[in-house]
Amino acid sequence: MHYPKVYDVIVIGGGHAGTEAALAAARMGRQTLLLTHNIETLGQMSCNPAIGGIGKSHLVREIDALGGAMALAADKGGIQFRILNSRKGAAVRATRAQADRVRYKAAIRETLENQANLDIFQQAADDLIVEGDTVKGVVTQMGIRFDAKTVVLTTGTFLGGVIHVGLEKSSGGRAGDPPSIALAQRLRELKLPVGRLKTGTPPRIDARSVDFSVMTPQPGDFPSPVMSFMGDVSMHPEQVNCYITHTNEKTHDIIRGGLDRSPMYTGVIEGVGPRYCPSIEDKIHRFSDKDSHQVFLEPEGLDTHELYPNGISTSLPFDVQFELVRSIRGMENAHILRPGYAIEYDYFNPQALKFTLETKAINGLYFAGQINGTTGYEEAGAQGLLAGLNAARRAWEQEEWTPKRDQAYMGVLVDDLITLGTKEPYRMFTSRAEYRLMLREDNADQRLTTIGRELGLVDDVRWAAYCEKMEAVERETSRLQHLWAAPNNPMGKKFVEMTGADLSKECSAIDLLKRPNINFSQIAELTGSEVSQQVGEQIEIAVKYEGYINRQHEDVAQLKRLEETKIPADFDYDVVSGLSREITQKLKTVRPETLAQASRIPGVTPAAVQLVMITIRKNNMTKKTA
């Protein structure tokens, strides 16, 4: 059957990348189709039941600032909230939400089903319709043809997915779901650069069989933080503890004894696993000097006894899993509800993409999520939103948009993937962002919501809330600039009495806030401020980090000069005099779009960038005089 409706955007896959892609395109007014093999799994958390964390919450806040769904779903489904790095600087603070899987998934599905311009259809996609070098649509498992101006692929771990438990293996996209075999074969036919990666998950445990009394409880923060700029604590369901226990030497001996049947250590698995989320067998092998490793027992939800033992991801045979679990303190009688497993899947070298996440080889075809070599819900959601908005803009022949490295962690993510590529699952960290003081999770809305409004991603309700917040920040900052404390006036005396600090000369309330040991809550008490905690936080960070932020703005200005120098798509690096063969090859492989991108390619020296710039300028001068 040839479906009668022509879509602007078709999104294949209903995971974290797919849902954000479909929602973004639909919010922008494009006729959008979301194809999923199973409507019941829309927004499913396939691995750990958590959103956010170091570097990751910055992405979640950016998705949220652009009108995305992930942060609000985390607020509606979060059963524990914590601020990580709370004693460190604002740039590296991160919010983490332990999520109830069912509530999170329900929140995502509710958002999808109530989104205008979005159709959902339950069918696996088996084929792409490609005419010449342009995608024209999709063919499903039943042979239904859907036509579209653009297609976004967000296939997660489903492309050629193989599940491993010990030396046994089976086809699967995740436990209980079939893989995408036909689509994987079709993509390989298109001559896109393909590789194999792997990820894993731990065995799930029945909480009724665990002795929590010998473990360390890990409560959430109080007052509880929120994930979304539109979130409120009243959205949160009941809050619960996680628990911490440890592996021991007996656990490690059991694991070592099972390595001869490990698919990782017998060469059965060829795909590379995530460096920063290693399996327990990998930890024992790589960190043999450690006599224990932490295990975090995380509730999967309020209405289930299922626990996620974060820290013991494994693909060892089930009998070894059984022994290693029961060797851990408090889990001596643990009942395993689901075995752990590893999954191996196809991904495509992201260097074959444009910065918009459109493939260079096929016009109108976009990739987002694990298909690009990333790991994590947050990384997937960020790519999905970018791919969806750019597919939407291309469908209406509008100029596409991608944030720069100094604008967003999304920009860092995309630039890293396309400039550097990846041979292992890529995870975001704050350390990857050179301008992280400007890219804090607290100011994601200031960086992106205005842009999101211009792109059509931000609705009236969010826009009004953002404008109200920024007006409050401006009003309160101005008020504090005009309130003065002097050694002998009432405000000055109250300040000294409250804080025990010295006050030798007249200072504005803003100047007092610049002091290292003074926080906004003290200034609020001193001056009778009634603004929200969120507004106060913005003012405090802006005041305390003003000098550092100004310095980063200067660095960005220098970078922009390189960003503004575009490298023509057909630029011939072979004619650049003085370039080494190695650097020439690297530049030809990556095909950087700007001098700034060229400067970030490993091994490309500042001198080489200078040579390319000189050649571009010479070429431009030649064209002008011709």
UniProtKB/Swiss-Prot annotation:
Subcellular location: Cytoplasm
Stored InterPro entries: FAD/NAD-bd_sf (IPR036188), GIDA_C_N (IPR049312), MnmG (IPR004416), MnmG-rel (IPR002218), MnmG-rel_CS (IPR020595), MnmG_C (IPR026904), MnmG_C_subdom (IPR047001), MnmG_C_subdom_sf (IPR044920)
GO biological process terms on file: tRNA methylation; tRNA wobble uridine modification
Obligatory cofactor(s): FAD
Binding annotation for FAD: 13-18
One Gene Ontology molecular-function label: flavin adenine dinucleotide binding
A GO CC term assigned to this protein in UniProt: cytosol
Top-level taxon: Bacteria
Classification via Pfam families: GIDA (PF01134), GIDA_C_1st (PF21680), SAM_GIDA_C (PF13932)
PROSITE patterns: GIDA_1, GIDA_2
Residues engaged in binding NAD(+): 273-287
Location (main, coarse): cytoplasm
Keywords of this entry: Cytoplasm, FAD, Flavoprotein, NAD, tRNA processing
Quaternary structure and interacting proteins, as annotated: Homodimer. Heterotetramer of two MnmE and two MnmG subunits.
Annotated family: Belongs to the MnmG family.
Function: NAD-binding protein involved in the addition of a carboxymethylaminomethyl (cmnm) group at the wobble position (U34) of certain tRNAs, forming tRNA-cmnm(5)s(2)U34.
HAMAP family per UniProt: MnmG_GidA
Record's protein name: tRNA uridine 5-carboxymethylaminomethyl modification enzyme MnmG
Organism: Acinetobacter baumannii (strain ATCC 17978 / DSM 105126 / CIP 53.77 / LMG 1025 / NCDC KC755 / 5377)
